[in-house]
């Protein structure tokens, strides 16, 4: 397990609003212990998760979001 900005399949962040419970819910649904809305340089507001399982993608630096 590891902490990180949870990633959608195309290496895109899950955008969020500071103070909302959306990230905590998303992270727990994906098997993490929780999360919050953080700021990822170059990506903007993004969900940060704690203790995500290794099979859940996190943002890889240097690879652009490609939808």
Curated annotation (Swiss-Prot):
GO-annotated biological processes: defense response
Domain of life: Eukaryota
CDD domains per the UniProt record, alphabetical: neurotoxins_LC_scorpion
Localization per record: Secreted
Pfam families hit by this protein: Toxin_3 (PF00537)
GO terms of molecular function: sodium channel inhibitor activity; toxin activity
Expression (tissue specificity): Expressed by the venom gland.
Domain LCN-type CS-alpha/beta: 2-66
Stored SUPFAM superfamilies: Scorpion toxin-like
GO CC term, one of those recorded: extracellular region
Its biological purpose: Alpha toxins bind voltage-independently at site-3 of sodium channels (Nav) and inhibit the inactivation of the activated channels, thereby blocking neuronal transmission. Is highly toxic to insects (tested on the crickets A.domesticus). This peptide may also be toxic to mammals, since it is similar to alpha-like toxins that are active on both insect and mammalian sodium channels.
Domain comment, as recorded: Has the structural arrangement of an alpha-helix connected to antiparallel beta-sheets by disulfide bonds (CS-alpha/beta).
Name of the protein described by the UniProt record: Toxin Bl-1
């Amino acid at each position: 397990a590891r902490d990180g900005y949870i990633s959608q399949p195309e290496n895109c962040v899950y955008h969020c609003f500071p103070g909302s419970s959306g990230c905590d819910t998303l992270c727990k649904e994906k098997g993490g212990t929780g999360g919050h809305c953080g700021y990822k340089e170059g990506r903007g507001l993004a969900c940060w998760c704690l203790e995500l399982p290794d099979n859940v993608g996190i943002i890889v630096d240097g690879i652009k979001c490609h939808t």
